[in-house]
Amino acid sequence: MQEYAEGNELFQRVFFKKHEAELIKLAKEGQSPKALFIGCSDSRVIPDLMVQTKPGDLFVMRNVGNFVPRYKPDEDFHATATAIEYAVSVLKVSEIIICGHTHCGACKALYEEISDPSLIHTRKWLSLGEEAKQNAIRALGSGADKEALLRLTEQFSILSQINNLLTYPYVNKLVKEEKLFIHGWYYDIETGHIRYYDPDQKEFIPLSDVARSCRIPDADTL
């Protein structure tokens, strides 16, 4: 706890003091983020630092594997769906970023047997990555180099989650109206570089090379 206490003191002295005016404004007027960022819970993925956003810019939803379950019209407890619903319908974000990353533990676990009976939620959750795994195996073959297979699975997973996101009626509607834009990002934790999925080239290209595009990847162009 000592390191956290010292970190908070440093935060107050440096970051908070530097951004005090905008933070107080956000507290008084409320948030109006530009984008919903759906990322992995992995501790090596740090959204605000990765793209140097300001406080209030990103509404962040993180889970294991940056997975998006398909839309289910029920009133059960759905953390990811709730974040999407709130960001799109209440906060009116204009962009959704689904950010996967290299060396993803969730994608690696897709190729491992989960025998621990206590991991019932983990086993079920990982099924959301099965489509990406099968696509990678079809593309490279089951005997392919393991690291190459994992990297491709991570990238295919981003595309799978975009397709799942488009099953949400209110998301699909706004995308078709060009009022909401979806982006697939692939973060390299070893270099800090981000690659962006270009639906025209059907590949991930450096984010630094991408001008903001109005062409949104959907189920037909992926």
Predicted regions and their residues:
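Divalent-metal-activated hydrolytic enzyme cores
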Residues: 1-33, 66-94, 105-222
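Generic structural signal for well-ordered secondary structure
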Residues: 30, 43, 51-54, 77-80, ...
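Short beta-strand segments
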Residues: 38-40, 62, 99-101, 183-188
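Catalytic core of membrane glycerolipid acyltransferases/transacylases, capturing the structured
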Residues: 44-67
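N-terminal low-complexity or amphipathic/hydrophobic leaders
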Residues: 28-47
